Structure formats: C-alpha cells, structure tokens
From Swiss-Prot:
GO terms for biological process, alphabetical: DNA replication initiation; regulation of DNA replication
Location in or out of the cell: Cytoplasm
Domain comment as written in the entry: Domain I is involved in oligomerization and binding regulators, domain II is flexibile and of varying length in different bacteria, domain III forms the AAA+ region, while domain IV binds dsDNA.
UniProt cross-references to CDD domains, sorted A to Z: AAA, Bac_DnaA_C
Cited Pfam families: Bac_DnaA, Bac_DnaA_C, DnaA_N
Protein name: Chromosomal replication initiator protein DnaA
Native source organism of the sequence: Nautilia profundicola (strain ATCC BAA-1463 / DSM 18972 / AmH)
Gene that encodes it: dnaA
Length: 436
C-alpha cells in the first residue's frame, strides 16, 4: 500500500465527517512529487482550499510519522495541475520546484512586450551553450519569466541533462550538503549538468556562501560550454547584494526583459489559457478580464479558474458578463478612471502636431491616419472604454474596425523598433499623468 493510501486510510479511520466529500478523491501526483515535496491533486479549487485549511497539517504529520521526513506539500487542482490554490496564493509570487510540462514555447503567447525574451530563449534552446551564455531574463511578477525558463528546459530535457531549480532550492541543497558533510554530492549534481536553469536569482542577495558556491558552479559549467539561464525580478546591475564577480558574469551574457503585456497580448493569453484548460468564456468576458485586471498573468489565470469553478459549483451552463463581474467584484481594484478618451486625443494631437479634431475626422492624410491609429491603440490600453464606444468616438464603422486598426498598429510595433521606443515614451507620459 502506498504511503498516500495509508494516509487517506488513517484520515478515514479518524472518522472525519467530510472524508467522502473532501479526502476520498484526492490523488497523489507520483510523477511530480519527491520524497520531501508532495504534490496532491484535488478535483477542484474549493476542495483544494478546504483540504489545505483543514487537513494539511494532519497530512504532513501522518507522512512524517511514516517516513521521518517533514514534507513540503502543494495541493493543486486537477484542472490546472501545479497551480497554487487560493486566489490570494495565485496572486502571490510563487515559483514551481519542478519542470512543468505545460510551460512550453508553444503555449507561450508572443507580443511586443515579450518578443525579445521569447526569441532569445528559443535561440538558446535551439543552440544550447553556443549563442548566449548566460541568458538572463528579468521582469515583473507573473509576466512569464518562469514559463520561458521552463520552456527551455522542456525543449531540451529529452536530449540533455537539464537541471531546473529556484535559487532557494539551490541554496537549501547547498546548506544541507554542507551540514551533512557531503559537498561532493552537491558538486556532482550541479557541475555535471548540460543545462542549468536557475529561477529568481534575486534571492541570492546577501547569501555570500551560496554566491561563492554558485560562482564556482557557474565557472565550471561555463568553461565546459554548458548553457546557463537565469531569471530575476530586476536586471543584474540592480542586484545590489550580489558580489561583483557574479554580477559581472551575469552581465557578460545576454540580458533580456519582459514587459507587462499590451492589451492584445493579454487577450490572446487569456484565450490560450481558456483553450488549454477547456474553459469556454465569451469574448466580451475575456475583454472584460483583460481590461479590468493588471498585468500579472498569474492573477488573471486565478480569475479564470475562479469564474469557471464558481459556474460549475452553481450549475451555471452559460457564463454571462454579469456573472463574471459578480465573481470578480472583490478582486477588481477600484481604480479611478483618470485617463479619458479626450486626454488621449489631446496628447496625440500634441505629439503629431495636429488638431484634436483632425484625429476624429475622416481625413486620410498619412500623418493623421497614423495619429488616429496610435490614439485608438492607447485608448484601448489606458481607458476603460469598450471597443464599440471607442469605434463610435473615432468615427469608425464598428468594433472590428478598431481591432483592425490595432492589428496594423501592433504589426508596426513589432517591425519598427524606433517606433516602439516612441510609443513607449508616449505610454510613460500617460502613466505619469495617471499617477499625478
Ligand atoms: N506570454 C505568455 N503566454 C502564456 N502564458 C503566460 C505568458 N506570460 C505569462 N504566462 C503565464 O502566467 C503565469 C505566471 O507566469 P510565470 O510564473 O512564468 O511568471 P514569472 O514572471 O516567473 O513570475 P514571478 O516573478 O512571480 O516568478 C504562468 O502560468 C504562465 O504560464
């Protein structure tokens, strides 16, 4: 009998009223668990939350009694394996401890905000140890750093010895091996891989012994032309508590950033997540989530899961916009509507040296058309107006004309780096106005 079956049996024998409802259908994820880190699958988010609140300590205790090991336990839902569970947890930064098969290049949506990082990661995966070494990916919370790092690992794991760890795991293992007087075991593991992927290296900050060890690991692998990829929440030059020689190693490779996704990219990501998880959401709800929530994709995923789970539990077959609004009510921060369509028009008119009225006119003058497209794009990014309202305001036929204008705009953003910089500057100006 497996240990997990024994644990379930003990929970049953303790006559827990909720055994059938909450414990019976829990499954042990053998493939992804280790002896110190257990992953348990629950049928849905509510059961998972309940088990976490009520039974986690008990399960941990029973496991320790059986094995002598105090485990770390993650309870995940079957729908989205490996996801942390409560909405609060989903919003919290969390990093997995194993390679997650779903994090691939194919499931990663590319837009102007992450194009550079994606291309660099793909290139590293296709030519490990040859093009960019190390690859350093940085960016804000929940923007896809781990996903890209793991995509490299998943791409290479069948042909090479890939090692994926968080900086914390690296540190814990190092400390543990020192404590057990087995440093050679640690060296054996880390200095003999072909690809080393370390997530969240900002946590090396201030840990001098770990940094020292990592420095040697780095050199050893680098000299053997093994690929090293790192992620952090900031660029190497801002990792202040890192020893200089390590920082300069990081800086010697390719450094790429991931920016918050543009609205279109966000919408695409939501579509993809729904598709991957077999969730159907009408377009208007997808757009609602994308415009109302910030850029943290993990948070967005949490909201999709929540809407889906609530609809199932309440037996609702068709999810309406009102239902979604209700479900997300408490999670949508009450941001004041500070940027209006008029603000955008004024700003663009000034930038393009034309009159505000010309932007909303029917003129086909090249400069005015460019200004209009830009204004439409920014209106979608920064105001809370729906696509039909924006169409009406700019004198366009209907919402599909808005989508068309945004598509052409995104194409230009992708192709023309000077243009991209100009738009970034405009976005910054709007952000400044927003925070005034
Ligand atoms: N462009 C994208 N396409 C598809 N999914 C994405 C994209 N960007 C982020 N995600 C998803 O968002 C979630 C959070 O991403 P990830 O864990 O990679 O973020 P992170 O940048 O590593 O965040 P943290 O700083 O908290 O570690 C993941 O489920 C990931 O699949």
């Amino acid at each position: 009998m497996s240990i997990f079956t024994k644990i379930k049996k003990s929970l049953k024998s303790e006559n827990l009223v909720n055994y059938n409802k909450f414990i019976k259908n829990l499954e042990f994820d053998e493939k992804n668990s280790t002896s110190t880190h257990l992953i348990i699958k629950a049928p849905n988010i509510f059961i998972a939350n309940f088990v976490k609140r009520k039974y986690l300590n008990k399960i941990s205790e029973l496991y320790e009694k059986e094995t002598g090991i105090k485990p770390k336990i993650d309870i995940v839902t079957k729908e989205i394996s490996h996801r942390p569970l409560t909405i609060e947890e989903i919003i919290e930064p969390t990093t997995p401890s194993v390679l997650i098969p779903e994090y691939t290049f194919e499931s990663f949506i590319v837009g102007p905000s992450n194009q550079f990082a994606y291309t660099a990661a793909k290139s590293v995966a296709e030519n490990p140890g040859k093009n960019y070494n190390p690859l350093f990916i940085y960016g804000g919370v929940g923007l896809g750093k781990t996903h890209l790092l793991q995509a490299i690992g998943n791409y290479l794991k069948s042909s090479l010895n890939v090692l994926y760890v968080t900086s914390e795991q690296f540190m814990n293992e190092f400390t543990e091996n020192i404590r057990m007087k087995t440093p050679e075991r640690f060296h054996e593991k880390y200095r003999n891989c072909d690809v080393l992927l370390i997530d969240d290296v900002q946590f090396f900050a201030g840990k001098e012994r770990t940094q020292e060890e990592f420095f040697h690991t780095f050199n050893e692998l680098y000299n053997q032309k093994k690929q090293i990829c790192l992620t952090a929440d900031r660029p190497p030059k801002k990792l202040y508590d890192l020893v200089d020689r390590l920082r300069s190693r990081f800086e010697a490779g390719l450094i790429v950033d991931i920016q918050p996704p543009e609205l279109e990219t966000k919408i695409e990501i939501i579509r993809k997540k729904c598709e991957l998880n077999g969730i159907y959401l009408p377009e208007e709800i997808i757009e609602y989530i994308a415009t109302k929530l910030d850029s943290n994709i993990r948070e967005i995923e949490g909201m999709i899961t929540k809407i889906n789970a609530m609809s199932k539990i309440l037996g609702i077959s068709e999810i309406t916009l009102d239902f979604a609004k209700q479900a997300l009510k408490e999670h949508i921060k009450d941001k004041k509507e500070v940027i209006t369509l008029e603000d955008i028009i004024k700003l663009i008119a000034k930038e393009f040296n034309i009159k505000p009225s010309e932007i909303v006119s029917k003129s086909r003058n090249k400069n005015i058309v460019a200004a209009r497209r830009c204004a439409i794009y920014l209106a979608r990014e920064f105001t809370k107006e729906s696509t039909p309202i924006i169409a009406k305001y700019f004198g366009l036929r209907d919402h599909s004309a808005v989508s068309h204008a945004i598509k052409s705009f995104n194409k230009k953003l992708k192709e023309d780096s000077e243009f991209r910089i100009k738009i970034e500057e405009l976005k910054n100006k709007i952000q400044i106005k927003k925070s005034e």
